[in-house]
Amino acid sequence: MKLTIATALVGILLIACAHVANGSDCGCPKRTTPKPCTTARPTCAPVTTTTCRPPTTTRCPPPTTTRCPPPTRPAECTATTKRPTARPTTKRATTRRTTVRATTKRATTRRTTKRATTRRTTVRATTKRATTRRTTTKRAPTRRATTKRATTRRNPTRRTTTRRAPTKRATTKRATTRRNPTKRKTTRRTTVRATKTTKRATTKRAPTKRATTKRAPTKRATTKRAPTKRATTKRAPTKRATTKRAPTKRATTKRAPTKRATTKRAPTKRATTKRATARPTSKPCGCKPCGPGGEPCQGCAKRDALCQDLNNILRNLERKVRQCVCGEPQWLL
């Protein structure tokens, strides 16, 4: 908003300065020049020349002594602009050429490709459940009878305080016994260490007897309180109003069994590819098929150790199977 107001004020100032410079506010009005005649040659008629009227010159009246009021805007505009003296000027007729250019618009072709949109509409069977309304019965508010208890105030009981006489304790001074200092002998250590025992003189302290003062038994004044009887108020039994509720019957709506559309799927056949088993081209090392009456096996040096291990495993399994008896704590031979 501030920018627009500032630009408007600047524009008004510029227009006022331009009017003062040209003298349009106080001088002659602008002269109007007549438009030139246009001659057009017809195609069939003879050529005719048309003459235009000479331009008429209009003279301005002598300048009057009317002065413009001084401008209220900054003094820079008024100081630099001078009013020109009005002189009669004759303007020549100016002919303007108008050239019309042929504008060719290019035809713009827009390609509109509409895609076929397929919408799937699935209609689902909606079953509305019947709304069951429950009847609510409002209970009448039950007021309870309030009974006020009688408050009994107790009489304040004053206690008698007895001050005890201060008892002075007899102080007995203990006899201090000084111990004789024992001199220790320093022995130089040799390869064999000699150990000497020093006996310390022990002084027995005399038992100190403390003076015992017997205190006189202090008797406290006992005041018997009168038994306070409390007023007992029997409350009347409050009977509550019992309202029997009518059994509410719920509307049972039987739903129609909904049948689901079962679509049978066509059995899909899987392409079965038979794997080609590569048969060994080299003859295996070993014996011919086992059985009685066959040829004896000469053995295979490459597989002897493996065959022996397998035979040992089979023998151990057979032995464990024979030892196993259900329910026995140990293996049986």
UniProtKB/Swiss-Prot annotation:
<feature type="signal peptide">
    <location>
        <begin position="1"/>
        <end position="23"/>
    </location>
</feature>
<feature type="compositionally biased region" description="Low complexity">
    <location>
        <begin position="74"/>
        <end position="88"/>
    </location>
</feature>
<feature type="region of interest" description="Disordered">
    <location>
        <begin position="51"/>
        <end position="285"/>
    </location>
</feature>
<dbReference type="GO" id="GO:0005576">
    <property type="term" value="C:extracellular region"/>
</dbReference>
<keyword id="KW-0677">Repeat</keyword>
<feature type="compositionally biased region" description="Pro residues">
    <location>
        <begin position="60"/>
        <end position="73"/>
    </location>
</feature>
<keyword id="KW-0732">Signal</keyword>
<protein>
    <recommendedName>
        <fullName>Salivary glue protein Sgs-3</fullName>
    </recommendedName>
</protein>
<feature type="compositionally biased region" description="Basic residues">
    <location>
        <begin position="89"/>
        <end position="277"/>
    </location>
</feature>
<dbReference type="GO" id="GO:0007594">
    <property type="term" value="P:puparial adhesion"/>
</dbReference>
